Amino acid sequence: MPLLQGLSMYARLVVSLPALLRQQDTPEKGLALLRERQQSREANLLRLLERAVYADPRSPYLHLLRHAGCELGDLRRLVPQLGVEATLERLRAEGVVVRFEQFKGREPMVVGGREIPVRPEDFASPVSAPHLMGLSSGSTGARVSQPVSFEHKGAQRAVRLAVRQLQGVLGPPRAVIVGTLPESSRFGGALDGGGAGNLPERWFTPVLSPPRVPELRFRIAHRFVVAMARLHGLRIPRPEPLPVAEVARVAHWAVDAVRRRGAAVVQATPSMALRIALAARSEGLDLGGVTFTTGGEPLTEAKRQRILDSGAQVICSYHMKEAGMIGAACVRPSGPNDQHVMTPHVALIQGRREVIGQPVDALLVTQLLESSPRVLLNVETDDFGVLEQRRCGCPLDALGLHLHVRDVRSYKKLTAEGVTLVGSDLERVLESELPERFGGSPLDYQLVEEEDAEGFTRICLRISPSVAIADEDAVVAALREGLRRASISADLAFRLWNQSGAIRVDRVAPPMSVRGKLFPIQSSRREAAARRGAGSS
């Protein structure tokens, strides 16, 4: 970041932070905002397009919109006539779509046969300047800068309180498992709103291996924000390093909190929640009264069941770093990964695309809040899932949030010997069938796409050394059998890989990402890119 730009950003930080810390938010205020924004979606979308797209000659979206022959006047006519989602569907059909890799700056946009190079910062909003810069997790490639806007946090804070109250997780003692800058801009809950019992009691920070020391600029910014929060009377807990081998500490805290107050809430990724649940069971702890609020990765049925076996409850929300909360966990879900789309803040539609010859309904997100530091207009999320209108009868449904998104999965894929598998074919086998047959948990198995010394792509099945396996070939055979049942294409892919020697077993523990996520499918190239991004950040 250029020096003057950085100084300007930190000046905004010093000026804006006290106002955010003084902001009084309540669940009642959040409910009022939800109703107001739900009623104003069309006006909010048009205002955002006018100020952040059509008024900005550098906006990448202008290339797409003008190639589609769409001017602001056309949208002013279409949006009231068709509604938000139908208008976005019309734009998608005309090619107004930004692919996930383009939004991350890894591929150029192609408009009318012409390549247009783009960077992540090209999608910055001209009407909402950032106050801090964090970094993405790097789980899908090299880490990129993530702008943090206090204005945007302030616009969502009361709403988050309202959602937590409706989900029944506002008030009990809470522990958060999040990092510090640049991994997370949560500051241990300092900016989540100090009222309504929302401050966490404990703040655990995952310890990476090997340890990573944040740059000086991140350490200074982090300490400044936390110190200012404490000066404003917010009793933010001190971060406690949490190695993976010591996650039972969280379970012991939760059991004690239930004893003291009757309930406890732990905020973590699904993978971290599963680790805590397994640690509790191994130590004979009953997590009855504990609720895990999760996000950042899908809550699969296998993870959910293992967590429930500990006595705890678990809900999962759908987040995207650039868009915020896309889906809020339904408390009367149709499955483990069922959320109410936060339609007051975002619009979510689907676009059919081909992934290795198979059609998937990719999710496209549009941000409706003008306070967002990134402009998102029909941006692919790298996920697919099911969108449906459903009346579930839960408190969020009563607010008019009838659009649900469920069964969200990434269409990450493994490719070797010219044959590719979509991740959904592999997930059930890795997370359910192999642990049931050979022991361990969904955290102990992972498939990785890698290159050998000669440049051939190979598939590595990682199995944690903690799982006692006498015959590794039996695991490979079980993997093949599971894929044979999954689909014809999965069976054919595995047969070819096995025949060409493209599969090997590695007895190492599958690593978690910087935010405590564990993906059952990974690419060594993505891992290497993430490490390079971390080193150059």
Residue ranges and their predicted role:
Residues 127, 346, 506-508:
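Short loop/turn microsegments at loop-to-beta-strand junctions
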Residues 4, 8, 12-21, 36-310, ...:
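Active-site phosphate/ATP/adenylate-binding loop shared across adenylate-forming ligases
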Residues 1-46, 59, 187, 199, ...:
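AMP-binding adenylation
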Residues 138, 353-354, 513:
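Short, acidic, Ser/Thr-enriched surface-loop or helix-capping motifs
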Residues 275, 302, 358, 421-424, ...:
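Residues that form or flank phosphate/diphosphate-binding pockets in enzymes
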Residues 122-127, 340-341, 501-503:
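Short loop/turn motifs at secondary-structure junctions and domain boundaries
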